[in-house]
């Protein structure tokens, strides 16, 4: 996250983005979505036509499912703070941390719950979580997400 790389207007960004700057890519999408929602007040075919401010832009950001994705997670937290958007903190609530290896496998616990792995700073972590209604991570993430949504609605 480098605030000096974020543009004032989404039109100022050069497309496509590279993976090197998550914050700029998210900033672009956020600004474009908010602008598109705002413009609906002028669209005669929109149900938000004539509504001051257009469609309310509701945005919820999420961290990666575990805490090894430090650059991504830090960037998304800063964007959440900048914009005042709610943040689903999967990395803090998933049930394990990169700071402690699994006591039996002596590997990162995330590898037990992933279909594949990725190497970050020489350490192997789970990359894409197992999918399916009976998979622990999917159920855990769903519970964390639902709890966050309920806290916003109540």
What do the PLM-derived regions correspond to, one by one?
Residues 1-154:
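Alpha-helical cap/lid subdomain in secreted, periplasmic
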């Amino acid at each position: 996250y480098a605030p000096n790389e974020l543009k004032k207007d989404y039109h100022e960004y050069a497309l496509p983005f590279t993976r090197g700057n998550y914050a700029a890519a998210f900033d672009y999408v956020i600004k474009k979505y908010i602008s598109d929602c705002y413009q609906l007040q002028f669209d005669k075919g929109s149900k938000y036509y004539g509504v001051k401010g257009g469609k309310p832009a509701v945005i919820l950001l999420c961290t990666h499912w575990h805490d090894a994705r430090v650059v991504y997670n830090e960037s998304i937290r800063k964007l959440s703070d900048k914009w005042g958007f709610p943040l689903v903190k999967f990395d803090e609530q998933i049930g394990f941390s990169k700071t402690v290896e699994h006591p039996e496998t002596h590997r990162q616990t995330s590898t037990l719950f992933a279909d594949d792995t990725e190497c970050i700073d020489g350490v192997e972590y789970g990359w894409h979580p197992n999918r399916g209604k009976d998979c622990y991570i999917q159920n855990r993430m769903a519970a964390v997400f639902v709890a966050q949504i309920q806290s916003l609605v109540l």
